[in-house]
Amino acid sequence: NIDDLHQMAGNKNVLELHGSLKRWYCLSCGKTSNKNFSCDCGGIVRPDVTLYGENLNQDVVNEAIYQIEQADTLIVAGTSLTVYPAAYYLRYFRGKNLVIINNESTQYDGEASLVLKTNFADTMEKVLNIIKK
């Protein structure tokens, strides 16, 4: 997600495969900022997000693959796993527990230790209510 919601929720070490609307850069000189700006060079400034047809940041991709390879448990939630290349990264998981939480079936359900066919947001709300008690 490009909306920074994970960071606002307190998550650390978020890998932004598709970039972030919180960062902007100049296409001409590469100057960056955490807000939209007019570049001194007169170049076009755009948000640091990956649009359809553009390549993902390879450093972020490599780190995502590394983290997946190292994980003992991987929870995949709220995704149909049909958008590539991100859906392909599950092939790197070698851990013990693959958990898929999605309201529809996915192509990886047969490989998962646990599949919960439910709405992720509703499920997390119930989990949080249990934890708060």
Predicted regions and their residues:
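Conserved catalytic alpha/beta core of Sir2/sirtuin-type deacylases, generalized to analogous enzyme cores
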Residues: 2-133
